[in-house]
């Protein structure tokens, strides 16, 4: 069971994540991204098995309140999982680029190809997932492993040594057929 601090980037999917995580027995506390990074770091230090989860949200990572600062200050110190905007923020924090995707997708199912490793172990390949995004990561640094793609688009990354990963898609959406299992396997990987 993980102690998850979920950074809410003011997105309606945040509470889908909360419900799914709590129904799996995880402890979840939620902080909005306008809270000072110092306050969030202090709260994380009080948790027994802390995981920082970065929610989806509108706009770009730079517009997401304290999220970029948290990523800079906490890299390598605790597991972090980013979803959609959170994934994009991870890519930028590690030196990658986030820009306009070739197509805008909101509420569309796509079949992604993955490497079958870590959080994707035992998952169907291709894996149907829900996509809601107009931005996509590119020019990734070598320390980020791309572990899922849709065509040439990066759909998931991980940093094994730092226990950091991100999903461009939404595992909490009903359109992601194995989303609950993927979140559980992700948390197990993050805390290993």
From Swiss-Prot:
Subunit record text? Heterotetramer consisting of two non-identical subunits: a beta subunit (TrpG) and a large alpha subunit (TrpE).
Q: Which cysteines are joined by disulfide bonds?
A: none
Gene Ontology MF annotations: anthranilate phosphoribosyltransferase activity; anthranilate synthase activity
EC numbers listed for it are 4.1.3.27
Role this protein plays: Part of a heterotetrameric complex that catalyzes the two-step biosynthesis of anthranilate, an intermediate in the biosynthesis of L-tryptophan. In the first step, the glutamine-binding beta subunit (TrpG) of anthranilate synthase (AS) provides the glutamine amidotransferase activity which generates ammonia as a substrate that, along with chorismate, is used in the second step, catalyzed by the large alpha subunit of AS (TrpE) to produce anthranilate. In the absence of TrpG, TrpE can synthesize anthranilate directly from chorismate and high concentrations of ammonia.
Keyword Magnesium listed? The answer is no
What is the protein name given in its UniProt record? Anthranilate synthase component 2
Q: In which pathway does it act?
A: Amino-acid biosynthesis; L-tryptophan biosynthesis; L-tryptophan from chorismate: step 1/5
Q: What's its catalytic activity?
A: chorismate + L-glutamine = anthranilate + pyruvate + L-glutamate + H(+)
User: Some GO term, biological process aspect, for this entry: which one?
Assistant: phenazine biosynthetic process
- The UniProt transmembrane annotation reads none
Q: Superkingdom of the source?
A: Bacteria
